[in-house]
UniProtKB/Swiss-Prot annotation:
Keywords: Amidation, Neuropeptide, Secreted
Keyword Ubl conjugation: no
Protein known as: Cardio-excitatory FMRFamide homolog NF1
GO biological process: neuropeptide signaling pathway
Record PTM Phenylalanine amide, positions in chain: F7
First-listed, main subcellular location of the protein, grouped into a coarse class: secreted
Function: Increases the rate and amplitude of spontaneous contractions of semi-isolated hearts. Increases the amplitude of excitatory postsynaptic potentials in abdominal extensor muscle.
Length: 7
């Protein structure tokens, strides 16, 4: 995902 550890 876009909000998971900068990804």
């Amino acid at each position: 995902n876009r909000n998971f550890l900068r990804f």
